Amino acid sequence: MTSQELKAAAKSFGADLVGIASTASLAYLPKEDNPLSIFPQAKNVIIIGRKIPRGALRGIEQGTEMDNSFAQFGFIDLEDNFLAKTTYDVNIWMEARGFEAVPLFAYDCTGQPVGVPVEPGKPAPNVILQYRIMAQAAGLGETGLNGLFLTPEFGPRQRFAMLLTDAEMKADKPFQPYLCKDCGKCVPACPLQALSPENGTKAGFAGCESLVAARDNDLCRRCRNGAFVTNEGRFSTVERVAAACSRACIAALEERGATQEKITHPFRQSAPWGRDIVGDKVQ
């Protein structure tokens, strides 16, 4: 099985994005973040992405519909049904060809507490891979200033899953950042001023890092501008793809022609709206 055959199969099962990262390139990661802690025989990590329809953000962008479209087609159903089905189908396709693959959702576990190793030298449970590093290692994109993962195809509009496999294939080259360019449009777009580039840090795959602004998670949890807190199954993190910071990013990337997907009318068709921490309108 070649990487081209794998990618063609994934696309036939509905994947919009497919990348491959070798586990050897990820050997520098600590045990708690390393795919080999889950599957020591793995040779590659396959990253599968499905895009978030731009239309799923239309209601939030214009302040007309805040829950149904994005919550289902941009997040919950997209991850739990459409992306899961694509990943499952690729998994079964690989096993039918004699290769094992471990399927994993790409959940954000930033800041979550870890357990205690069962013995010295073992990773602290639970091992949950940093999907942004995996996706960048697989050549799919970069982490932007706002902390969201950006691809050349869709900007921040995608969801990811992963397969750890013992199949030996040609891996993709890591993605060198060029999309965000620290344009900074996300920073003033946040009515709560939750992003602080001056206190930011470098993040990403080793040698391909980019600046990520410090973020006040407590403010994000109280955001009334398209963000919402996920359930415990997703570690109660803040989902921000529809938030003001992300929508400003989508508009900025489109305006300078940085995203490959072209849609007839621009994403931003009117002045952005915003609400402060108590829900009052802001200019």
Predicted feature locations:
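Long, internal scaffold/assembly segments composed of regular secondary structure
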Residues: I277-V282
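Catalytic cores of enzyme domains
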Residues: L29, Q72-G274
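Non-catalytic, usually N-terminal nucleic-acid engagement modules in DNA/RNA processing proteins
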Residues: M1-L83
